[in-house]
């Protein structure tokens, strides 16, 4: 339920608008609402962190608006709550009016949803399922530089799940489309909410099966097999891609030791 802040409320403050997050001094604000001049704003609790409520305020601040990416190296739980806040703020901003009848909607009090009192339609936040996979060949791992990535970072392959497709089918299809290779021994590892803008990353590991590596230039700048001790620039810690790479490097090292 939303409430108007009196200034006495305390907790973590997620102030978001248009996929941006208020990060005064580069950090997520914490403490009394009055200390951050938030009295009078409309807020809604979206979770708890370290025993304190986490509040969402949907508004633009005059300065200090940044990206939730700046919180990647903080605790994973707090990063996920910040991502939830940014996604919810954008969801409510983009669902002010019903797509069926055009009437104004309001936020549900019991769940993350927008409701239309006119036609009774109910809308939920969009979540885009994505697969991401680390592929091993002996003591090597397949890494690629994506066209949308900056700074020369090399990472594992990933892509969106298509309609009517299983996760396993999506992994095999994405790998074949982007690298021209076939995989085997596919196994699920973990998942990570990824608020850029509203993805859910489902992570896998796999082994190389067959095919000659040939990258898709529309998706990748380059791709190659890298020995575990000769890796290029990698994604930052805290990302599911980095975890997949580190887990695969362990397997590559074990394979190398057994081969000696």
Curated annotation (Swiss-Prot):
Origin superkingdom: Bacteria
Annotated EC: 3.6.1.-, 3.6.1.22
Residues that hold a divalent metal cation 2 according to the record: 174
Residue interval(s) of motif Nudix box: 159-180
HAMAP family per UniProt: Nudix_NudC (MF_00297)
Similarity-based family: Belongs to the Nudix hydrolase family. NudC subfamily.
Protein name, UniProt field: NAD-capped RNA hydrolase NudC
Species the sequence originates in: Yersinia pseudotuberculosis serotype O:1b (strain IP 31758)
